[in-house]
A protein has these predicted regions:
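Long, low-hydrophobicity ectodomains and other hydrophilic envelope-associated domains
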Residues: 1-158
């Protein structure tokens, strides 16, 4: 995972699955509902008019990654590197209508997003691909082998 991407986790059936750091078997609508079920509150504050100047809102989420020989789990900031050294701050962005319409499959975006169910409140939309103010890459010191099954746990934190 040496090539920079803004696509952290994408549903296997989504249009952007081939661009993701991790592919998931969950559908965006099911994932959205699961977050509601654990008490997360969606931000739903981004749209095409404000995306490049707005940071996503919604419940703060902790992501923990576990895989074979790493059962204790690793935080997203240990698994994915931000080129600026800023913490990745995943929020429950919401965006269910946009996700259903666009069919990208985006579960977790690495900058704020108006389509992804969750996204990073550290950067506005376009920071990776358009403005190029940040790059995200896998931290190979804390990264599963290619093709290794990974469990990603999302937890609401205050």
């Amino acid at each position: 995972m040496s090539e920079s991407t803004r696509h952290g986790v994408v549903s296997d059936g989504g249009k952007f699955a081939d661009k993701a750091v991790f592919r998931s078997f969950v559908k965006p609508a099911d994932f959205h509902q699961a977050l509601l079920d654990i008490g997360a509150v969606p931000g739903n504050n981004m749209n095409k008019d404000n995306a490049e100047t707005t940071l996503t809102e919604g419940s703060n989420l902790k992501l923990t990654f576990t895989w074979k020989d790493q059962e204790s789990g690793k935080d997203i900031n240990d698994v994915i590197k931000d080129s600026n050294g800023n913490p990745i701050q995943i929020r429950f962005s919401g965006n269910l209508d946009n996700a259903n319409e666009k069919k990208t499959g985006c579960i977790t975006c690495l900058d704020s997003c108006l389509v992804g169910i969750t996204s990073n409140a550290s950067y506005p939309y376009g920071s990776v691909e358009k403005a190029k103010t940040v790059e995200f890459n896998g931290n190979m010191e804390n990264f599963p082998l290619d093709g290794e099954p990974v469990v990603i746990t999302y937890e609401v934190v205050e």
